[in-house]
Amino acid sequence: MRAVGVFLATCLVTIFVLPTWGNWAYPCCHVTQLRAQHLLALENISDIYLVSNQTCDGFSLASLNSPKNGSNQLVISRCANGLNVVSFFISILKRSSSALTSHLRELLTTLESLYGSFSVEDLFGANLNRYAWHRGG
């Protein structure tokens, strides 16, 4: 339980919800299906940036970043389905809701708000080819 709290506190402190920042450097990315050797290990993820579905034409996206071992230099960044990332962390936080700090309770509220902002109507209006899922190597 303590490890989950530490992980959430260190990794999720940097969550940014960007509903109106269309000029942020490449907030909309392509989600690719990666082979196992190209996946980021959960314990190596240092930052997770969530992009609102209103920023990327109805798509909820997330950027998962991992630094080079022993440095602050970003070497790996992966694009992910933001709705899945948000759902995963909501599930973890709700399982341990009685032990959450006020900061993590606030994070849970923010994540639930972001999750609630997603609608099928947004996706139906999206250009599905713009951020199409690609099979990667």
From Swiss-Prot:
GO terms for cellular component: host cell Golgi apparatus; host cell plasma membrane; membrane; viral envelope; virion membrane. Residues 23-128 are annotated as: Interaction with gH. Keywords: Disulfide bond, Fusion of virus membrane with host cell membrane, Fusion of virus membrane with host membrane, Glycoprotein, Host cell membrane, Host Golgi apparatus, Host membrane, Membrane, Signal, Viral envelope protein, Viral penetration into host cytoplasm, Virion, Virus entry into host cell. Residues 1-25 form the signal peptide. The keyword Glycoprotein applies. It comes from the Viruses. It is found in: Virion membrane; Host cell membrane; Host Golgi apparatus, Host trans-Golgi network. Disulfide bonds join C28-C56, C29-C79. It is a peripheral membrane protein. GO terms for biological process: fusion of virus membrane with host plasma membrane; symbiont entry into host cell. The heterodimer glycoprotein H-glycoprotein L is required for the fusion of viral and plasma membranes leading to virus entry into the host cell. Acts as a functional inhibitor of gH and maintains gH in an inhibited form. Upon binding to host integrins, gL dissociates from gH leading to activation of the viral fusion glycoproteins gB and gH. The heterodimer gH/gL targets also host EPHA2 to promote viral entry. Interacts with glycoprotein H (gH); this interaction is necessary for the correct processing and cell surface expression of gH. The heterodimer gH/gL seems to interact with gB trimers during fusion. The heterodimer gH/gL interacts with host EPHA2 to facilitate virus internalization and fusion. HAMAP family: HSV_GL_alphagamma. Belongs to the herpesviridae glycoprotein L family. This is Envelope glycoprotein L. It comes from Epstein-Barr virus (strain GD1) (HHV-4).
